[in-house]
A protein has these predicted regions:
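Second-shell loop/turn segments in exported
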Residues: 39-46, 113-116, 141-148, 175-179
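Helix-loop-strand module that forms the ligand-binding subsite of alpha/beta enzymes
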Residues: 76-166
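N-terminal beta1-alpha1-beta2 submodule of the flavodoxin-like/Rossmannoid cofactor-binding fold
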Residues: 23-108, 120, 190, 194-200
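Positively charged n-region of N-terminal signal peptides that target proteins for export
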Residues: 1-4, 8
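Hydrophobic core
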Residues: 9-17, 197
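Soluble non-cytosolic domains of exported or imported proteins
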Residues: 45-49, 120, 148-152, 179-183, ...
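Glycine-rich phosphate/pyrophosphate-binding loop and the adjoining helix
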Residues: 166-200
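Hydrophobic/aromatic beta-strand patches that form the interior of the parallel beta-sheet core
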Residues: 30-32, 67, 112, 141-143, ...
């Protein structure tokens, strides 16, 4: 009997059945975000953007894949210059390009979309992303950082644009909190995910 078990194990190992069982299940949740480092309002000069920190917390709690919208042409690092560029993009309804594409888009059922609120608006580069992919049948969940404007009108704007998706209630966290209070932000995220009925 022991010889038979040993023989079966040898065959299993040689045929690669064990590695097949050991493969990780592909994630069905994706966190996509745009974030800006450098000089930020109310937090000074930072190495990692506020929304990036928030997005990574969400990805960790949801065991999700993560994709950062990295602009082809970088935004200025100083606040006033970045303000000028963003204002001009809003005025002209620009669609800034970003680096790379999302692989296996169809495997994701749930997509978190993160961004800072820039002068009352979603940054235009996020529109570039939202207009590039088919969200039909997906669940979309916005999240954002801000310094007093909350979600502004971003929830409504996303609902109006992504009509084929189910858009759940988003979460807005002050950028200063996301930047400096990881524990508090993690608690906010956990409570929010529970409220909108997502397992963690």
């Amino acid at each position: 009997m022991k010889k038979l078990v040993s023989l079966i194990l040898t065959v299993v190992l040689l045929t690669g059945i064990v590695p097949a069982f050991a493969e990780e299940t592909p994630a069905h949740v994706l966190v996509v975000y745009f974030s800006h480092a450098g000089e930020n309002y109310n937090v000074g000069v930072i190495e990692e953007g506020n929304t990036a920190k928030m997005g990574k917390i969400i990805a960790e709690q949801m065991n999700a894949d993560i994709f950062e919208l990295v602009p082809v042409v970088e935004y200025p690092m100083d606040y006033d210059s970045c303000l000028d560029v963003a204002t001009e993009e809003q005025r002209t309804d620009a669609r800034p390009e970003y680096v790379d594409e999302i692989e296996n888009w169809d495997q994701y059922d749930t997509v978190f979309i993160g961004y800072p609120i820039w002068w009352g608006e979603i940054p235009n580069i996020v529109y570039t992303f939202m207009e590039a992919y088919d969200f039909t049948g997906k669940t979309v969940i916005p999240f954002n950082t801000h310094e007093g404007s909350g979600q502004a009108r971003s929830q409504r704007d996303i609902e109006e644009l992504l009509t084929g998706a189910t858009v759940l209630k988003g979460l807005a966290v002050r950028g200063s909190k996301a930047q400096n209070d990881a524990e508090g932000t993690s608690a906010d995220v956990a409570n929010w995910l529970k409220q909108i009925g997502l397992p963690q």
